[in-house]
Amino acid sequence: MKVTLSALDTSESSFTPLVVIELAQDVKEETKEWLKNRIIAKKKDGGAQLLFRPLLNKYEQETLENQNLYLVGASKIRMLLGAEAVGLVKECNDNTMRAFTYRTRQNFKGFDDNNDDFLTMAECQFIIKHELENLRAKDEKMIPGYPQAKLYPGKSLLRRLLTSGIVIQVFPLHDSEALKKLEDTWYTRFALKYQPIDSIRGYFGETIALYFGFLEYFTFALIPMAVIGLPYYLFVWEDYDKYVIFASFNLIWSTVILELWKRGCANMTYRWGTLLMKRKFEEPRPGFHGVLGINSITGKEEPLYPSYKRQLRIYLVSLPFVCLCLYFSLYVMMIYFDMEVWALGLHENSGSEWTSVLLYVPSIIYAIVIEIMNRLYRYAAEFLTSWENHRLESAYQNHLILKVLVFNFLNCFASLFYIAFVLKDMKLLRQSLATLLITSQILNQIMESFLPYWLQRKHGVRVKRKVQALKADIDATLYEQVILEKEMGTYLGTFDDYLELFLQFGYVSLFSCVYPLAAAFAVLNNFTEVNSDALKMCRVFKRPFSEPSANIGVWQLAFETMSVISVVTNCALIGMSPQVNAVFPESKADLILIVVAVEHALLALKFILAFAIPDKPRHIQMKLARLEFESLEALKQQQMKLVTENLKEEPMESGKEKAT
């Protein structure tokens, strides 16, 4: 029997809460009632057909401080039909991956009518988020109770409620039992081990699981570099000609690990089903604004903003501002070099142990200033990118990433390039590289994990005391959980985490022939990073909504670009070494030609390796080709069925015409 959404029951008074909606304190009752009715209404009537109830009943709201918090869930059948609507891909009994449909649910591995574990909690929360975001305005002209909050047919109600300040936030709840199991296998025991990536994916979703998978992969990939770099550092410190072998290995290593990651990523995302998920049509991002008009593609009414105005904002405001920030970064760099000269002069005059320690102070101060500048610039870049008024979220993210990467690259590495190619002081280069790398790692650990964790612990203690003081007859556990989680910080995505790895990759690869110990420090940091990031996700931030991902996106290109730049810098550094210069004492032109030739040969080798190593393993390519073939065959059969039905109808119509 075919089950439709209209047949589902939405009157369950008790259900498993998955998502919390927080409304503003002064929201009017008619607005609350309207929102509730739209959420629980049947799909055919324009509702989401979800389960919805307040955290506190009327008596509890009178007894306690009314927080305007509401819980959202869904019945099992509603979840399964929602999984079909969002296009979730699951493993079938024949070990193939296919888009889930409720009609063929028995064909999927692990499905049972009495089993509630077929969909992960992250998938269930993603489905609820999808349904809430797809609540559309119908014939309403405004939000009830708020005449200034205009509504337009077909536009998302949730986005309008958020931008109007009526809805404060929407967030998924943690599952305490599942979270405890995940913590026990993930980070509670500090040890050299693989992470439970599939469990992370089941709890947090594919985007976060891919980050932790990449962090783990990158850390283990650094171990050969660290093992080889350690003896080079200890035994051949000044023999730059011997670093040629190490640098060449580094360049091949950086190419191979990035290509092998793409294969490993394809394996994971195929197993999770996200490699097969179709890309959906993007709607305007919440912050997009413009004059109301008709979209020429969708035919729907939405805000329109001329492209030339956006380009003017980018080239006349954003670009000059970025250039000004880059200039300021270079100015700060020159102040740092003045401090280095001052510290060196002081040490040469006195030669004491105190002044030998003082030699590292300018680099430490500069590293701290770099971190501060990076964070301040990030806020400015977000403001500018939002002001540019990009229509799509993907365009917004691409412009933001470009701004941040350019500034961070120059801010972090400009001083090292200046020391290497202008001052040509290899000793100072090693010292600066080591100090910048280690200081930035320590600061990131403190600012991103330990400080937020300490603040969250203090807040948690206050909430527990408040709940223990309550005399009301309520579900104290759920109440405490919701109150605690709503005050947690919001996880803003994997942007900063990937950026940290990107800069670390730069420190390791750009100047490997000068400081081979960088990989060892990166490995030590990343083992700590895995645990601190896990703690951050589980105990510091709100649980983020799951976001399906097939790869790490634009960051793959960023890492590949960094590996290409590292070829140029390492070849140039080796060409500048005294040992190599001694081979060409008279003709510098010959030296330059040979260095350029070697650099081109290594770049050619990189591109050959990248081409020779397929992005997807052979067995996955075969499975994808098979699925594409079956989809085309199914489409042909459907078309043939329609043609056959039309041919059957034609004789009947012609017979009627003859009879008349």
Curated annotation (Swiss-Prot):
Q: What is the topology of this protein in the membrane according to its UniProt annotation?
A: Multi-pass membrane protein
Instruction: Pull the Extracellular topological domain ranges from the record.
Output: 229-240, 338-352, 422-500, 575-590
Give this protein's Gene Ontology molecular function annotations. Answer: calcium-activated cation channel activity; chloride channel activity; intracellularly calcium-gated chloride channel activity
Cellular localisation:
Cell membrane
> What keywords are assigned to this protein?
Cell membrane, Disease variant, Membrane, Neurodegeneration, Transmembrane, Transmembrane helix
Tell me a GO biological process for this protein: monoatomic ion transmembrane transport
TM segment ranges: 208-228, 241-261, 317-337, 353-373, 401-421, 501-521, 554-574, 591-611
InterPro entries assigned to the protein according to its UniProt record, in alphabetical order: Anoctamin, Anoctamin_TM
Q: Which Pfam families match?
A: Anoctamin
Q: Which residues lie on this side of the membrane: Cytoplasmic?
A: 1-207, 262-316, 374-400, 522-553, 612-660
Q: Which GO terms describe its cellular component?
A: cilium; intracellular membrane-bounded organelle; membrane; plasma membrane
Expressed, tissue-wise, as follows:
Highly expressed in the brain. Intermediate levels in the retina and heart and low levels in the placenta, liver, lung, duodenum, kidney, testis and spleen. In brain areas, highest expression in the frontal and occipital cortices and in the cerebellum. Lower expression in the fetal brain than in the adult brain.
Query: In terms of one coarse class, where is the protein primarily found?
Result: membrane
The protein's job, in short, is: Does not exhibit calcium-activated chloride channel (CaCC) activity. Can inhibit the activity of ANO1.
Disease tied to this protein = Spinocerebellar ataxia, autosomal recessive, 10: A form of spinocerebellar ataxia, a clinically and genetically heterogeneous group of cerebellar disorders. Patients show progressive incoordination of gait and often poor coordination of hands, speech and eye movements, due to degeneration of the cerebellum with variable involvement of the brainstem and spinal cord. SCAR10 is characterized by onset in the teenage or young adult years of gait and limb ataxia, dysarthria, and nystagmus associated with marked cerebellar atrophy on brain imaging.
Q: Any remaining note in the record?
A: The term 'anoctamin' was coined because these channels are anion selective and have eight (OCT) transmembrane segments. There is some dissatisfaction in the field with the Ano nomenclature because it is not certain that all the members of this family are anion channels or have the 8-transmembrane topology.
Family to which the UniProt record says this protein belongs: Belongs to the anoctamin family.
Q: What is this protein called?
A: Anoctamin-10
Q: What organism is listed for this UniProt entry?
A: Homo sapiens (Human)
